[in-house]
């Protein structure tokens, strides 16, 4: 027994009065609920951050490939100008020079907008960028390398817009 306060027994202090048990249960219940709310808030925050990243990536892709349709429709124009330059030969003339200048200006504008020309003569065949239309033999070109290009290919911001149509050197 406690001598200062005989009404309190030290053994009584170690035991919980019956009315505190429901309070402890409620405190534990509230702690569990707080933990669940914190976990939900953390998940929501992570979902929001993932959504922000996804939207930023989508906006970046939309910006990078906004000109895809226009540049794709200009590819036949590039082909025609290239064919015209080939047909005009190598002799300088005002018409050929004008055609060459126009072609170079158009290619520069396209390049400034992310277009890259694929002209793979002499390079190893790459099925991700080239479409083989036949095989042939060529002096000085290793087997499996591009011998001739029938139609140039193009990349738009490193994504294939049109494969190059090529002839590949035969393997012996």
From Swiss-Prot:
One of its GO terms (molecular function) is protein-folding chaperone binding. The keyword Cell wall biogenesis/degradation does not apply. One of its GO terms (cellular component) is cytosol. Residues 1-25 are annotated as: Disordered. It is found in: Cytoplasm. Pfam families: GrpE. SUPFAM superfamilies: Coiled-coil domain of nucleotide exchange factor GrpE, Head domain of nucleotide exchange factor GrpE. Its main location: cytoplasm. Participates actively in the response to hyperosmotic and heat shock by preventing the aggregation of stress-denatured proteins, in association with DnaK and GrpE. It is the nucleotide exchange factor for DnaK and may function as a thermosensor. Unfolded proteins bind initially to DnaJ; upon interaction with the DnaJ-bound protein, DnaK hydrolyzes its bound ATP, resulting in the formation of a stable complex. GrpE releases ADP from DnaK; ATP binding to DnaK triggers the release of the substrate protein, thus completing the reaction cycle. This is Protein GrpE. It comes from Xanthomonas campestris pv. campestris (strain ATCC 33913 / DSM 3586 / NCPPB 528 / LMG 568 / P 25). The gene is grpE.
